[in-house]
UniProtKB/Swiss-Prot annotation:
Pfam families linked to this entry: Suc_Fer-like (PF06999)
Coiled-coil zones: none
SUPFAM superfamilies membership: Thioredoxin-like (SSF52833)
InterPro entries assigned: Aim32/Apd1-like, Thioredoxin-like_sf
PANTHER family found in the cross-reference section: ACTIN PATCHES DISTAL PROTEIN 1, ALTERED INHERITANCE OF MITOCHONDRIA PROTEIN 32
Family that this chain belongs to: Belongs to the AIM32 family.
Phylogenetic placement of the source organism: Eukaryota, Fungi, Dikarya, Ascomycota, Saccharomycotina
Signal sequence segment: none
Superkingdom classification of source: Eukaryota
Protein name, as recorded: Altered inheritance of mitochondria protein 32
Alphabetical list of CDD domains matching this protein: TRX_Fd_Sucrase (cd03062)
């Protein structure tokens, strides 16, 4: 049995669902610690000499970016391809190759809109269509729209305006600021005015998401652990109805094992309300425990980075 923690985290009040925060019991923690030590040693044996080793003793910060939308550029190729290891360079903003050059362009058009995260994703199942190699269309999945948009490269600037439409309360802290550590500074919000464009319709795909960081050239720890965690999802048949994918850098590569869950709230009503839950120090041997508790409305604090609700 897991025991309920008495500690209250600030994010709890903002979820659409009610989650209970729990801690691992001491006996289970001892077993987990032994498994973690063994696994980290095996990962470190695979790492290049230039990569800092995986240290399971690093403290996990309870911190995530504050954002309004998550834009995922879908990588081409089937699930056996390895763009996360080969095509995703250290900084995708500087990638000059299609389709990844679209990330830097889109981010430049959104430079005054810090509440939008942009990542590449390599899908590991077939619920959402993926582009073919050399496809003329760019495939973007946008959360919480829960829509797949097929965009021409010449329409990227207009698409950026579309993503940024309306009047929203956008956080001053950008995702890039978050990645370099500025999230430690208290942030205010500002009202941002945008164009109103309705050109882009998109196709709706209402499913939860499980995203695992596997950005090898950003940090080999994530690049080695990401596929192991994906294999654990598949071998243990965990959250099989979720979209599953490897995602580019989302911070936290120092401790690695980063997993993001997007959980829809009353999806049958097409409300597009969902909870964003970020975890770190997730290993193949503790993934099942994490997922089973999450499905029962319980968050394991030892792996919890933070989260927000989205509409």
């Amino acid at each position: 049995m897991l025991r309920t923690t008495v500690r209250t985290l600030r994010q709890r009040a903002f979820f659409h669902r009610s989650f209970v925060h729990v801690n691992l019991p001491e006996l289970h923690s001892a077993i987990q610690d032994a498994q973690t030590t063994c696994y980290c040693q095996s990962i470190n044996a695979r790492l290049p000499s230039t990569t800092d080793p995986l240290d399971p003793q690093i403290k996990l910060p309870h911190r995530t970016p504050n954002y309004n939308k998550h834009v995922l550029l879908v990588s081409p190729g089937d699930k056996l391809a390895q763009p996360w290891k080969i095509a995703w360079n250290h900084n995708l903003d500087t990638n000059l190759n299609r389709p990844y050059n679209a990330i830097g362009k889109l981010r430049s058009y959104l430079r005054n809109s810090p509440g939008i995260l942009i990542n590449a994703v390599h899908l590991q199942n077939e619920f959402v269509p993926r582009p073919k190699e050399g496809d003329k269309w760019l495939f973007f999945f946008v959360i919480p729209d829960m829509k797949l948009y097929k965009i021409r490269e010449t329409d990227l600037e207009e698409f950026a305006s579309f993503l940024d439409e309306g009047v929203v309360q956008a956080p001053r802290l950008s995702f890039q600021d978050y990645l370099i550590g500025k999230a430690k500074v208290p942030q205010e919000t500002q009202q941002v005015h945008h164009k109103n464009l309705t050109k882009f319709q998109g196709d709706i795909f209402l499913r939860d998401w499980s995203l695992v960081c596997g950005h090898y050239k950003r940090d080999a720890k994530c690049g080695e652990m990401g596929p192991d965690i994906i294999a654990a999802f598949q071998d243990e048949k965990l959250l099989t109805d979720n979209n599953l994918g490897l995602i580019s850098h989302v911070g936290g590569h120092v401790f690695a094992g980063n997993v993001i869950f997007y959980k829809l709230f009353k999806a049958e009503n097409a409300l597009n309300k969902l909870d964003s839950l970020w975890f770190g120090k997730v290993y193949p041997h503790n993934l099942k425990l994490l997922c089973e508790n999450l499905e029962n409305g319980k968050i394991i604090d030892e792996m919890y980075r933070g989260g927000i609700s989205m509409n």
